Amino acid sequence: MSAYGIEYLDDAMRNLGEMTDYAVNACGMDLEDFWKLFLTTGYAEKFGEGVPRVVSGFSGTELAEEVLRKAGKKDELPEPQVEFTCSREYWSGWILAYYQWYSEKKFKEIEAGLPVREVVEMYPALHEAPEDKFVEAADRIIRRKEQGKNALRRIRKMAGYTQK
């Protein structure tokens, strides 16, 4: 069962999209660097748990500012953006919010199997597709990586090697 109801999903998706767009396109941060901050400051976990203040209480810009403040990035932040276009970064945050909600996986777990840089690369092919197409593609990528790790683990075990 998802951490929050479907009635909050659109807001959650918009906010995560706005958060990533603001961090990259207004603040000039590298998407991967900002995403790591999102994951390590605890906000990704709170978002995934459905904490109302994080999912829909903050705007996406406010959420980005909170992440940056908690990470110790207290530089002067640009003015909030009024309008957001569907940039690659916006779409990446937007679709990851959907995928996290749908799959019920933690953002850290998603990042381990499908890094945000790979999500951005999926933009040209999937940004106009229904969300379930992204879910299928993401599940396939994550499953393939997990199978590869398990196969390597089996080969090491059969050869008598251990990984420490």
Give residue spans per PLM region:
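Intrinsically disordered, low-complexity and often Lys/Arg-enriched segments
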Residues: M1-S2, G72, Y161
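N-terminal interaction modules that seed assembly of large macromolecular complexes
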Residues: L9, M13-E66
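Long, compositionally biased
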Residues: P52-F84, R88
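Thiolate-centered catalytic microenvironments shared by cysteine-dependent enzyme domains
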Residues: K105-E111
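Glycine-rich, aromatic-bearing surface loops/beta-hairpins
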Residues: E121-Q163
